[in-house]
Amino acid sequence: MVQAWYMDDAPGDPRQPHRPDPDRPVGLEQLRRLGVLYWKLDADKYENDPELEKIRRERNYSWMDIITICKDKLPNYEEKIKMFYEEHLHLDDEIRYILDGSGYFDVRDKEDKWIRIFMEKGDMITLPAGIYHRFTVDEKNYAKAMRLFVGEPVWTAYNRPADHFEARGQYMKFLAQTA
């Protein structure tokens, strides 16, 4: 089951959990109200997983690739990690399936507070187009993820502020309806 919580405001290494004391957990229903979808799958059989194929078919996730985020495998690792951690949005959904390793997706709630979502092997998440978010590996500095797309991949990040995009406006309308 996914673990998520409101982040503390402490400065420091973004790869640390940043759990407040006392803890402020966030459940799947609260994530769903933000448009975030989550599945737990068997990452050991991702190449032939009927459950993954069903999700891909139902949601039209027709294109995929695999990215390994670690110093030895990802060119310009430090630069990429900083880029992933910049607060941004996309004009399309962001779909990630963790095949190995772990990391954190941070998303903004309706009050603009950060929610940290711990992702580990077998976790698959969809972040809706228009949601402000960021990603970092955890202290293990390693994550292998499947990136899925509807149609041809478009991976353009628009750093905040990016409220003028239609995807952001549509997302804000969605949030207003889930109030």
UniProtKB/Swiss-Prot annotation:
It is a peripheral membrane protein. It catalyses: 1,2-dihydroxy-5-(methylsulfanyl)pent-1-en-3-one + O2 = 4-methylsulfanyl-2-oxobutanoate + formate + 2 H(+); 1,2-dihydroxy-5-(methylsulfanyl)pent-1-en-3-one + O2 = 3-(methylsulfanyl)propanoate + CO + formate + 2 H(+). Fe(2+) binds at residues 88, 90, 94, 133. Pathway: Amino-acid biosynthesis; L-methionine biosynthesis via salvage pathway; L-methionine from S-methyl-5-thio-alpha-D-ribose 1-phosphate: step 5/6. This is Acireductone dioxygenase. One of its GO terms (biological process) is L-methionine salvage from methylthioadenosine. It is found in: Cytoplasm; Nucleus; Cell membrane. Gene3D superfamilies: Jelly Rolls. It comes from Macaca mulatta (Rhesus macaque). One of its GO terms (cellular component) is cytoplasm. SUPFAM superfamilies: RmlC-like cupins (SSF51182). One of its GO terms (molecular function) is acireductone dioxygenase [iron(II)-requiring] activity. Catalyzes 2 different reactions between oxygen and the acireductone 1,2-dihydroxy-3-keto-5-methylthiopentene (DHK-MTPene) depending upon the metal bound in the active site. Fe-containing acireductone dioxygenase (Fe-ARD) produces formate and 2-keto-4-methylthiobutyrate (KMTB), the alpha-ketoacid precursor of methionine in the methionine recycle pathway. Ni-containing acireductone dioxygenase (Ni-ARD) produces methylthiopropionate, carbon monoxide and formate, and does not lie on the methionine recycle pathway. Also down-regulates cell migration mediated by MMP14. Its main location: cytoplasm. Binds either 1 Fe or Ni cation per monomer. Iron-binding promotes an acireductone dioxygenase reaction producing 2-keto-4-methylthiobutyrate, while nickel-binding promotes an acireductone dioxygenase reaction producing 3-(methylsulfanyl)propanoate. Keywords: Amino-acid biosynthesis, Cell membrane, Cytoplasm, Dioxygenase, Iron, Membrane, Metal-binding, Methionine biosynthesis, Nickel, Nucleus, Oxidoreductase. It comes from the Eukaryota. Disulfide bonds: none annotated. Belongs to the acireductone dioxygenase (ARD) family. Its EC number is 1.13.11.54, 1.13.11.53. InterPro entries: ARD (IPR004313), ARD_euk (IPR027496), RmlC-like_jellyroll (IPR014710), RmlC_Cupin_sf (IPR011051). Monomer. Interacts with MMP14. Its cofactor is Fe(2+); Ni(2+). Ni(2+) binds at residues 88, 90, 94, 133.
